[in-house]
UniProtKB/Swiss-Prot annotation:
It catalyses: N-acetyl-D-muramate 6-phosphate + H2O = N-acetyl-D-glucosamine 6-phosphate + (R)-lactate. Disulfide bonds: none annotated. This is N-acetylmuramic acid 6-phosphate etherase. The keyword Lyase applies. It comes from Streptomyces coelicolor (strain ATCC BAA-471 / A3(2) / M145). Keywords: Carbohydrate metabolism, Lyase. A lyase-type mechanism (elimination/hydration) is suggested for the cleavage of the lactyl ether bond of MurNAc 6-phosphate, with the formation of an alpha,beta-unsaturated aldehyde intermediate with (E)-stereochemistry, followed by the syn addition of water to give product. The lineage of its organism: Bacteria, Bacillati, Actinomycetota, Actinomycetes, Kitasatosporales.
């Protein structure tokens, strides 16, 4: 089946999107000196945080809802195509080393599968059926959250993922960069960060992509803070999988406890390198197994485990 008959309709849709708008004042940008183009681009990028700031109440409400589900064992699943999909995969892939999340706890789905991370997969973004199949492969539950990500807010893969997830009782979030988007309307929590026309007409990897990155940073990071994955602003659930991270682990324990280096090494040895446990050993003067038990009983929240140990 050819998709040619849909092209006029799609063109008219795109022409109504702010992210696709043409800016005649930039029509001769290619004639400018490089530094002037860089200044223009930097000025455009500087507008993105303000656009995100306008949506902070919606972002916070979504985060609180996600944290409730994840505390029950649910997963955070991003679904998008192209740049939006890649940003979701990026955010998901950074959660295990940063927050010691379990395998599959934060998932990035991109239309067309892993190959689409580096290669354009023709037609994949136009398939809501593909989104349903990808979610079926994850055996979605009502405790899971699906975040559809699409600059236009109309990408069939992202909209299809959200609609299907919602039909199964999962929590849904729709992140778009245009007002009145189908994606935000389909989701329980709609977040529309309107970044305006791009420097290059329709190149939504620019301001829209930056906005999506900022919002995804918030979704994962603040959710993990709510889940007790941090102690203050320290990454106490960091996974020490290489020498840099092992050094960071020692530094985090030092910052949290003020203990001497020898004491930190002993605590990390006694807790098999677990930063949270080592901090509890040092601050509450308990042994490794007791620290592990207290943390398990407090759902991994270090402050709660500390209160139990000292109370």
């Amino acid at each position: 089946m050819t998709s040619t008959p849909h092209h006029p309709d799609l063109r008219s849709q795109l022409e109504t999107l702010t992210t696709e708008a043409f800016r005649p004042e930039l029509a001769e940008i290619d004639q400018l000196p490089t530094l002037d183009i860089a200044r223009l681009m930097n000025g455009e990028d500087a507008t993105v945080p303000a656009a995100v700031a306008e949506r902070l109440p919606e972002i916070a409400a979504a985060i609180d809802a996600v944290a409730v589900r994840m505390a029950r064992g649910g997963r955070l699943i991003y679904a998008g195509a192209g740049t939006a999909g890649r940003l979701g995969v990026l955010d998901a892939s950074e959660c295990p080393p940063t927050f010691n999340t379990g395998p599959g706890q934060v998932v990035g789905l991109i239309a067309g599968g892993p190959d689409a991370m580096v290669t354009s997969i023709e037609g994949a973004e136009d398939s809501p059926e593909l989104a349903r199949a990808d979610l079926d492969a994850l055996a979605l539950t009502a405790d899971d959250t699906v975040v559809g990500v699409s600059a236009s807010g109309r990408t069939p893969y992202a909209v299809g993922a959200v609609e299907y997830a919602r039909s199964l009782g999962a929590l849904t979030v729709g992140l778009a960069c245009n007002r009145d988007s189908a994606l935000a309307a389909a989701a329980e929590h709609g977040i529309e960060v309107v970044t305006g026309p791009e420097l290059l007409t329709g190149s939504t990897r620019l301001k829209a992509g930056t906005a999506q990155k900022l919002v995804l940073n918030m979704l994962s990071t603040i959710t993990m803070i709510r889940l007790g994955k941090t102690y203050g602003n320290l990454m106490v659930d960091v996974r020490a999988s290489n020498e840099k991270l092992r050094a960071r682990s020692r530094r985090i324990v030092a910052l949290a406890t003020g203990a001497a280096d020898d004491d930190i090494e002993r605590a990390l040895t006694a807790t098999d390198g677990e930063v949270k446990d080592a901090i509890l050993v040092l601050l509450a003067d308990v042994d490794g197994p007791t620290a592990a038990r207290l943390l398990a009983e407090s759902g991994g929240h270090l402050r709660a485990a500390m209160a139990a140990a000292l109370g």
